[in-house]
């Protein structure tokens, strides 16, 4: 039997882990940077009218960007793989056709939501909405907002992962009441 099972979603993982905690009562804690309950709406708001361009053009531009930036290339391939498609544009189309809105009303476990002030407007909106709803269900549900001064205000705190991880593990220590002398 699992006594202390936590799940941590980063970036798009904030959507995939939301789906997991919505349905799996074995999960005792959810951490997300940032939580996403409606990925299609996020894509609509963040990518906007650029999604109306023809698939071949979007894929050509993304291929060029990937050739110039290896990290971007890996991220685009990762998203295509996560959605079971061959390219990023197909992944986006798949999201619009099949992605479900997470029923966050069903989430019962304590949550730690992490958000940088540098996040996109829709990511900040969804984080605040889900936090406001879930904090009343569980006193241990927290929202950590990183301002620019913290050096952790970028998407998923990539500019200060150490600080973000300190917040995560301090919260888990408190939540699970771990005895530090056992380690």
Predicted segments, located by residue:
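Alpha/beta-hydrolase fold nucleophile elbow
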Residues: 2-11
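Hydrolase active-site cap/lid region
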Residues: 22-91, 114
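Active-site nucleophile elbow and catalytic-triad environment of alpha/beta-hydrolase enzymes
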Residues: 85-103
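Short beta-strand/loop motif that positions the catalytic acidic residue
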Residues: 107-108, 113-115
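Short alpha-helix in the alpha/beta-hydrolase fold that links the catalytic acid
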Residues: 109, 123-133
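Acidic catalytic loop of the alpha/beta-hydrolase fold
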Residues: 117-122
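Catalytic histidine neighborhood in serine/cysteine hydrolases
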Residues: 131-153
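Catalytic active-site module of serine/aspartate enzymes centered on a nucleophile-bearing elbow/loop
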Residues: 154-183
